[in-house]
Amino acid sequence: MTKFIRIACICLLSILGVADLQAQDLYFVDAHSQFDQEVEGSFIIKRMDEGGVYKTILASRGQRSPGDAVVLAKKYPQRIVASVRSKGGPYANNSPKFYKQLQKQVDSGKFGAMAELLVFHAQKGDKADQVKMSLDDPRVQAALKYAKQEGWPFVVHIEFASLKGVERNDYLQQLNKFVAANAPLPIAMIHMGQLPVQDVAALIKAHSNIYFLTSHADPVSAENATQPWINTMDGDKFKPSWKQLISEHPDRFIFAMDNVWAFQWQDTYLRHIKVWRSALADLPPDVANAVAHGNAEKLWKLAPKP
């Protein structure tokens, strides 16, 4: 009996060792992040190397110009994909300048993605104003036209957890209509749309072209949060309902970090990677690889890591 227990323990440790090795070997593609004047490109690459992130789809923000993302992509062509910048004053004010900047970026041929379109963005203290518009807004439709032209997934930012009652239902109806009307173009909800698992499941069932970016959907973002992030995990493992949904639809979930502020690159980056690496290690390898990098590579037509 003692010998049997010893053998069983060795086998279990062996299995756990393989799982741990697989988790460490897993690489990531960050399908949506941003950087401003407080973050240097070399530091982004350093963080990516430390976290096992092979590629980042990156947009400029703040005082950085769209060209700064292009420069970084040219310097690190295997690691950075420049994303067309959408947000900023011209977007918020619906200025003619927004449409000119959008066209200039796309026509340059130097970008490989379209950054998120803010449709409903709740006030974030004194750091970010509320943005509120419909999916039929000319700004959204202009960016959508270019995404279709270039064959890029269209990333939508609607914070459903900050919407209530009739307004929430209206945005959900808008989203269903928008996704259906634009099939087969992939429509990706950043921050999982801040939607609970049952709503995500319903949208997946209703539409073959809706996807969910995992940014800020973990305990690192939920910790001391003033925003109603959707936390898919208990500790560093998926909650059962999320684990089941991701396992059943591994092609619909895409790893993304959406680093916006300097502290997210500097202080929390590796913590996010650690919890996602641990949570994904609990899933079959094909599922983990799809979420971590495979789905982004397929949808944005990115070369996998050699």
Residue ranges of predicted features:
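Mid-to-C-terminal alpha-helical segments outside catalytic/metal-binding sites
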Residues: 2-4, 26-27, 42-55, 59-60, ...
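Bacterial N-terminal signal peptides
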Residues: 8-17
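Sec/Tat signal peptide C-region and signal peptidase I cleavage site
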Residues: 18-23
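Mid-domain alpha/beta scaffold segments of enzyme catalytic cores
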Residues: 24-142, 146
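Active-site-proximal beta-strand/loop segments in catalytic clefts of secreted hydrolases
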Residues: 31-34, 59-61, 83-87, 116-120, ...
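Conserved, mostly hydrophobic/aromatic
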Residues: 32, 48, 114, 147, ...
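Active-site environment of divalent metal-dependent phosphoester hydrolases
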Residues: 36-38, 63-66, 89, 120-123, ...
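Catalytic pocket-lining loop regions of alpha/beta-barrel enzymes
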Residues: 74-78, 84, 130-254
